[in-house]
Regions:
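Mid-to-C-terminal secondary-structure elements
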Residues: 119-135, 146-269
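Short juxtamembrane loops and helix-capping segments at transmembrane helix boundaries
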Residues: 45-53, 348-378
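C-terminal membrane-exit region of the final transmembrane helix in multipass inner-membrane proteins
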Residues: 5, 25, 376-416
Length: 416
């Protein structure tokens, strides 16, 4: 039966080329937009390489100081982090990092680069794929060695396609030696950078023991998925008498990537609000699907009306309304899946165009063209969206068809 439905679907598509083109256009554009949007969300919150431990990784990027009922938020300093959150019992390892930018001028071309100061533990928490060399280790961090791990994009810029290991390049007037080359992380990730160097080469480190404000973040890899233990231990460490003078209390904020996204999308910078985030994302997805679904419903109603004689003949030979509803819904789902596959293909080019468009606003610091990656999660979500769109746009016209008067249908008219 399904085989016959598939054959009939293609015959109808070829017979009604105008409606087929409109339907496929609406579906493919809808799925294209949904795919790009889903890919963006997936790159932010999912455990994609090199951040394979995102579910149990916390980013500590803010400290709140309370004094006389007033609150002051700041990015913590390296000295504050090293003094107060090292050797946590609930964590497997802790890494410190900060991101800066520097400009290079090569072969008449000016380019901006993202520079990340970090430590040896950064490479234990993440899982970067090294195409050349290796990461820097504890001794190199302790000694303040001017060594660097660079991305493939940075290698292509400074060294073309030649081997980069052992070669030097300038960063803010100082020469760094390349010891490793990695595939880039997502530009939407906290671990993204063009160049990674030991934090001990950072001349802007806050060295004062009492300094609280700075530019550094901490990445905490929990031993288990129970992140409440890490947060409880952090709260116990923030004993004001032993940490910071001249304030009443101190609070640090450490969240996973999902929680970071939830904070930003719910307009609450202190705590994640999943309910509000789900509402915001849900509204966006509904808007993406509702408008084209309404258009497809109208097209399907018209298309079914033009098949009135066919429907009348089938009814007169004993086909039930349920049989016809199943047929038309399956036809619509098949067409929707075809449009969805086209939409997935279009999303690849659309994402590249979007990146090029974004790069026009900042020609120095350009995003990689492969910033949007279609993972199996995105593919599965888009497949589900196709099925949902097919059902939404097909059930109502099919139900209307089931009420069609047989006599009107056989005369070539309809009472839809």
């Amino acid at each position: 039966m399904l085989k016959n439905y598939i054959k009939l679907t293609f015959k109808v598509m070829l017979r009604k080329k105008y409606y087929t083109a409109l339907t496929l256009l609406g579906i493919s554009l809808t799925i294209m937009v949904i795919t790009v949007f889903a890919s963006f969300i997936d790159q932010i919150i999912s455990a994609n390489p090199p951040e394979i431990n995102r579910e149990r990784t916390l980013i500590l990027d803010k400290v709140s100081l309370y004094k006389d009922g007033k609150k002051t938020d700041a990015i913590p300093s390296l000295s504050f982090l090293q003094k107060n959150i090292r050797n946590l019992q609930s964590t497997e390892t802790i890494s410190y990092f900060t991101s800066r930018e520097f400009i290079s001028f090569l072969n008449g071309k000016t380019t901006g680069h993202v520079l990340k100061f970090t430590d040896e533990n950064f490479w234990k928490i993440t899982d970067f794929e090294f195409t050349e060399g290796k990461a820097f280790h504890l001794n190199e961090v302790k000694n303040g060695a001017r060594v660097a791990v660079i991305s493939e994009k940075t290698k292509a810029y400074f060294f073309n396609e030649h081997d980069a290991l052992g070669k030097t390049f300038p960063i803010q007037g100082l020469r760094y030696t390349v010891i490793g080359v990695v595939k880039s992380a997502s530009p939407f990730s906290k671990v993204y950078s063009d160049v990674y160097v030991p934090y001990t080469t950072d001349i802007n480190i806050q060295l004062t023991d009492k300094a609280v404000e700075g530019t550094y973040n901490a990445m905490l890899l929990a031993k288990t998925n129970d992140l409440r233990k890490v947060r409880a231990e952090l709260r116990s460490r923030m004993n004001i008498k032993n940490t910071v003078s001249a304030v009443d209390s101190v609070k640090v904020h450490a969240f996973t990537s999902l929680e970071q996204f939830s904070k930003s999308s719910s307009f609450n910078d202190d705590e994640p609000e999943y309910g509000k985030t789900a509402i915001v994302v849900g509204i966006i997805l509904v808007l993406f699907m509702l408008i084209p679904a309404i258009s497809l419903v109208n097209i399907n109603v018209t298309r079914i009306g033009e098949r009135a004689e066919e429907i009348g003949v089938r009814k007169s030979f004993g086909a039930t309304s349920g049989n016809l509803v199943n047929q038309l819904v399956i036809e619509n789902i098949i067409i929707t899946l075809i449009g969805g596959l086209i939409g997935l293909g279009l999303s690849v080019y659309a994402s590249q165009l979007l990146v090029h468009f974004i790069n026009t606003f900042d020609p120095l610091f350009k995003m990689p063209t492969d910033s949007f990656i279609i993972s199996w999660r995105v593919f599965g979500f888009c497949l589900f969206s196709c099925l949902l769109l097919g059902l939404i746009s097909g059930v109502y016209p099919a139900w209307k068809m089931s009420r069609m008067n047989v006599i009107y249908a056989l005369k070539g008219g309809n009472n839809l």
